[in-house]
Regions:
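A conditional alpha-helix N-cap/helix-loop micro-motif detector
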Residues: 34, 84, 138-141
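Conserved protein kinase catalytic core
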Residues: 62-63, 87, 113, 170
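Substrate-binding clefts and catalytic carboxylate motifs of secreted carbohydrate-active enzymes
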Residues: 95-257
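Active-site mouth of glycoside hydrolases
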Residues: 1-75, 81, 88, 99
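Short, acidic/turn-prone active-site loops that include or flank metal/cofactor-
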Residues: 82-85, 108-110
Length: 258
């Protein structure tokens, strides 16, 4: 079945690389996983000699990389999914493991929801998470790309995929990763990525929320652990500006965290 898929798509002009498994090591501990991935990569090389192979890791764990070097020599490019606090360490981990082939960052973005515990002010007493503002995320995306991806081209980094280029439909917090809202309007992170890729911002910029003090409920910020009573009246306030001077329309949504 896999070979049939390769034969079907190997000459498609949109095909760049064959990715064998996405974060497979997160679900399996048996080292035979890498033998299986290598067997698939070998089959792909025999069936389609014109496209490289990769496998995608959930982190740049040195031991996992060493296992791939030893057991999966038919992997041409290593792909890593990683987020704000861990991205700077990827290149060092690759070098420590002895990886000498190219690599890609196949997911990057702000601090993940599972990475908030080191920042206690971002975790509320009942376990809820304090999301970054769209402007804070914009800064994180731009910094991540400029300081850890673009600068490492000569160190084997082929490029990256920003997460998530679209409307987010999964995760604990509905607006955590998506760079677009449900209607297709952009968040500032889209501006950041266009600037990172082209050196110019888009002509029509996304609205800006300057500081955390510009998003309040009953005069408090989210990290103030706001508690409200059932059937009570509460006031939410957001202060936003548009870099282009466009008029803004405000849509309020109340969403349950998963």
């Amino acid at each position: 079945e896999m070979k049939a898929t390769v034969e079907r798509f190997k000459d498609h002009p949109a095909l760049l690389v064959w990715s064998i498994g996405n974060e497979a090591e997160a679900s399996y501990t048996n080292l035979k996983l890498w033998d299986a991935i290598n067997d698939i990569a070998k089959m792909i090389h025999e069936t389609d000699p014109n496209h490289p192979t990769t496998t995608t890791l959930a982190s740049s764990n040195v031991n996992h990389i060493k296992n791939i070097i030893e057991k999966a020599p038919h992997i041409d490019i290593l792909s890593v999914n990683t987020y704000a606090p861990n991205l700077p360490g990827v290149l060092g981990n690759l070098q420590s493991a002895g990886w000498t082939k190219p690599y890609m960052i196949t997911e990057f973005g702000p601090r993940g929801t599972w990475q908030m515990n080191p920042e206690p002010e971002r975790v509320l007493p009942w376990g809820g998470l304090v999301e970054q503002t769209s402007s804070e995320k914009e800064a994180d995306y731009l910094k991540a790309y400029q300081e850890n991806i673009a600068v490492n081209k000569d160190n084997g980094c082929l490029g990256s995929f920003v997460f998530l280029w679209g409307y987010q439909t999964h995760g604990e917090v509905l607006t955590w990763y998506g760079l677009f809202d449900k209607k297709g309007y952009t968040f500032p992170a889209v501006d950041a990525m266009q600037y990172a890729w082209t050196g110019s911002y888009p002509k029509n910029r996304a609205p800006v929320i300057a500081t955390r003090n510009d998003i309040l409920m009953n005069g408090k910020k989210a990290e103030d652990a706001i508690i409200v009573s059932p059937n009570s009246s509460n006031e939410a306030k957001v202060t936003a500006t548009d870099p282009d001077g466009d008029a803004l329309t405000y849509d309020w949504m109340i969403m349950k965290e998963k």
